[in-house]
Design a protein with these regions (language model features):
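N-terminal helix-loop segment corresponding to the beta1-alpha1 unit
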Residues: 1-139
């Protein structure tokens, strides 16, 4: 496969991010989906449903609590060996977690960092979550 030598860390949720990263997986990249622990022991996504299976096919997964010291340290170990990282977090969240581009490039200068956002990384709406339904109504 053309991308079999590439390791991608997937920190995306919803649809746009997982769809984009799925393309890497479909072309043979080693994609590791980094998932947060289930809130209150409840898994949000139906892992056996067709939508989840379609979005996350050909990906491996690990559950890490990036808010904990141990989870954050394990994540940084993954970053050291990664080629690409893709996330779709609000800018304030990734900075608070210490997983923004500026921080991670200190650990891995060759890391290609992709960030999806509905309203940009800064500006008046930079910290707002952005999903297709919200952006579609933005003109109203």
């Amino acid at each position: 496969m053309p991308l079999s030598h590439i390791r991608v860390l997937d920190l995306t949720l919803a649809r746009a991010g997982p769809t984009a990263v799925r393309q890497f997986a479909d072309w043979g990249a080693d994609v590791i989906r980094v998932e947060p622990p289930a809130a209150g022991g409840v898994v949000i996504d139906d892992r056996h449903g067709p939508d989840f299976q379609n979005l996350h096919r050909n990906k491996r997964a690990i559950t890490l609590d990036l808010k904990s010291d141990a989870g954050h340290a394990l994540f940084l170990d993954l970053v050291r060996d990664a080629d690409v990282l893709i996330e779709n977090m609000r800018s304030d969240v990734k900075h608070r977690l210490g997983i923004d581009y500026e921080t991670l490039r200190e650990i891995n200068p060759r890391l290609v960092y992709g960030s999806l956002s509905g309203f940009g990384q800064d500006g008046p709406y930079g910290t707002r979550p952005g999903m297709d339904q919200e952006i579609g109504r933005a003109h109203v």
